[in-house]
Amino acid sequence: YDLEANQIDVHSVSARKPLFMDESAHDWRLIRLGRRLGWTGVALKTCKTQTGALLGACWAKAHGMTLMVQDLTNPMLAQIPHVLLAAHVGTIAGVETNAMQFYPEASAPEAAVHPGENRMAKTDRPLRVILL
C-alpha cells in the first residue's frame, strides 16, 4: 500500500509478531518511515532497482531491522542479482523466488550456464531454490 498516504501505526502488531514491509519498501526513506511506524523487517526486491535494494538493506541493517529477499517473478538474468543480494545481506531464510515454478522454461538459457540457480528441490516444505 502507499505508506506515505496511509501512515498506520503498527507497533501493537509488531510487539507480538515480526512485521515485514513488502511492496512499499522500495526506497530507504520509506523503510525509515516504516520503522518509525513500527515495522520490524523489510522484504527487499531487486526488481524495484538493485540500488534501492542495496540502500534499503544497508539502512535497515544499521537500524536493527530483519531482512528478507523476495522477488516472486524474477526470471532469466534478473534472478542472478536477486539471489546474490540474498547471499550477502544476511536474510532470515535465504531467498524467496518462484519464477522457475511458474514459468520454468523462461530461464532455460540461463539455467544451462548457471544450473544451480534454477534447480528446484521438493521437500516437505514449499519449493525452494538450491544454490550451488
Predicted regions, residues:
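Catalytic core of soluble alpha/beta enzymes
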Residues: 1-73, 77-79
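Flexible C-terminal active-site loop/helix
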Residues: 72-132
